[in-house]
UniProtKB/Swiss-Prot annotation:
Biological role stated in the UniProt entry: Required for the activation of chitin synthase III (CHS3) activity during the sporulation process.
Single GO MF descriptor: enzyme activator activity
Inducers of expression: During sporulation and at high pH.
Gene name of the encoded protein: SHC1
A GO CC term attached to the entry: cytoplasm
Bilayer topology term: Peripheral membrane protein
Acidic residues biased stretches: 101-113
Protein name: Protein SHC1
PANTHER family: CHITIN SYNTHASE REGULATOR SKT5-RELATED, PROTEIN SKT5-RELATED
Sel1-like repeat coordinates: 318-353, 354-389, 390-429, 433-470
Species whose genome carries this gene: Saccharomyces cerevisiae (strain ATCC 204508 / S288c) (Baker's yeast)
Amino acid sequence: MSMTICSNTPGAYPEIGAYNEVDKQLESSGFSSDSSLILNKPEVRQYWSSVSSHISRSGDVFTNDKEKISSSIGEDAMDIDASPSLIEKYNSFPTRKILPEQDEFENDVEDDASSSLKEKSQGSCEIEIASEISSEILNGTSADGNSEFHDFAEPPPSQNESVALSFSQSNDLDFLNNPSGSGSSNDINRSTSSISLPRHVSLDFNVYNSLCLTNEVTASESHNVAKFHLGKKNKKSLLPRWKTIEMYGEVVKKTQDIYSNFQYAQYILRVGLDTEKLHELVKELEDESNSFSVDSLKEYLVNDAKVILKKLSAVGYPDAQYLLGDAYSSGVFGKIKNRRAFLLFSAAAKRMHIESVYRTAICYECGLGVTRNAPKAVNFLTFAATKNHPAAMYKLGVYSYHGLMGLPDDILTKMDGYRWLRRATSMASSFVCGAPFELANIYMTGYKDLIISDPDYAMALYEKAAALGHTESARILEDARRSGGFVSRGHPPSAQKYHKTSHEAVAAKKLI
């Protein structure tokens, strides 16, 4: 038994390979000593002649044994399924993949039954591999049974707890097929205010966004580079950018590819919200008769993106459902429609779109488009946090440590919140810059004998939060510099922020 580690496999899962002495002899006799994957034709013939003779001998032994058994127990009692033929064994042999497709050995195995058997066996193998991969993704576990968190951090606090998402019963997306949106009870806004949220796939295009890096974005940058190198005199020979966008849209709309349509809708929505790019496109269209103004071009692009996103959302594409819900909640199409955003977020959350799971939790927490429900908000936050969502880890850590959103104020819950804040701090960014600040407040005072006070580490966490853009941490560092490095350990800001009087606690319980 030999143990090898495949470096190309994500997570470096151990791969166990076992081989016997017969395989070693075949490899040493049939293959070149330089490489087992580079075969010369004489070596191939020699190898396959030895293999075929070995298989044929084993087949003769099997037929002789079969005749003896059939003579003793009768022909009818024998199994109907015969032994695998030489062709079947040849097609199922693992080293068959090494040979080229147009090899002379294929002339011996052109039987229809063998080819159909080969296709079935390959199809079943592909289905098994795909099912294993999908089960690993859904379960969040690696091939060796370990959790995905074991690669870089300690397991989450609620790893062993089963988290089941509960969705509202009135998840109605009829407005996707109703452009006017008139008179539907689902279209009523329970809250007309929007909320500034950290999101991985957002409409804030000033921040690097992996999902917004489409092929058309790259083409736009290449177009600018070409214009720069051509100069002012020769740039007229280059096709205007607006023409290329129109041509790209015509081709995409004729196709039935969902991802291509989503990329196009995302790009034109990005262009429609970028004032600088709109002015560049308007300047290119000044010489034409059907020139647009900035406002009319923006309205045209945004409405076109809205139509495409509605069609994709109606067929259940989760990325389109999230982006359309984000546009509704941000007021891109005019009035803020939180009810529609909530329905789209919850629909995408059913399809395991993690950012939509987090946004659904925010809707339940703040009452955006739905009645406030603290248990459901915590439920969705917990699910998103177990899937490595930084903002969900941060919020769940704060709520657990300070006993908010109906969570118990006991030691176990506090320690769970402390662990969630540690995990959120390890993944902190400019979007989630409050996690190091909250963890620093905990280390500044400590908690009983479970969390030892460490002011030096707390100051390092304040510096990390301030570098990410947290203003309160920057203020604390400035006060510490003025006082000669001394920071008060009595009442950290978070303790004052989340401290509740008895009347406030009673009101919060009634609300929950």
